[in-house]
Amino acid sequence: VGSEMCIRDRYKEHAWAKWGKRVLLALVCLGLVAFGYLESLVIRGAHTDGRAEDAQCVVILGAGVNGTTPSLMLSSRLQAALDFIADKPDIPIICSGGQGPGEDISEADCMADWLIAHGVDESRIYREDRSTSTQENFAYSEEIMAELGLDAGDMFAFVTNDYHIFRAGRIAGTDAACGVAATLPRSAYYDALQLNYYVREAFATGWLLLRGN
């Protein structure tokens, strides 16, 4: 009898182990499917919206500043913005970004200074230096757009890195927002860095969607 009970106990343990492995495998598969879906959203959004050509204003979303110098990511956004406005001499430009740790000046001031140094007329540039997040970038920039006489439904472009376009567009919360994609130079190092950002962005996008955005 004792041996039979021992066999039954071992069978139950084995059955539970098999069931546990199946559940774990199912969860892993579900996680991979969810990650694949989120990554597809990031990748599909990683391009410049053709409607941006009709934008009435352009907002450059801030990124890190090293002292007073734009970081790699911010430099790529500034170059993309400079290329975008090349044939739009009258469009107002909002440089949006506050001052964070390790930054001697605000991101807005850093961007404005860079644009002026690259030949952009200072009278076109508006500095939004209060924001500390993408949500605040848009909220405070919309206040400036209203002061410029733009209506809520007027098309505006926002410049950010390609991997950030989808999430930033969701945060903007309006069809009037058109992304302009900034990309990094091509090299083995930059490609690896870009891959890292794309993976991280999928998780950030998932968190955003879970919060109902």
Task: Describe each model-derived feature in a short phrase.
Residues 1-7:
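Short, small-residue-biased leader/transition segments that mark boundaries at the very start
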Residues 3, 13-19, 94, 99, ...:
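Solvent-exposed, charged interface segments at domain starts and junctions
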Residues 11-49:
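N-terminal type II signal-anchor transmembrane helix
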Residues 20-23, 118, 211:
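Short, isolated positions within intrinsically disordered regulatory regions of eukaryotic proteins
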Residues 28-29, 84, 174, 207:
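Enrichment for repetitive, rod-forming helical segments
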Residues 39-199:
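A structural signal for short, hydrophobic/glycine-enriched beta-strand patches
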Residues 191-213:
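A transmembrane-helix-recognition feature enriched in membrane-embedded lipid enzymes
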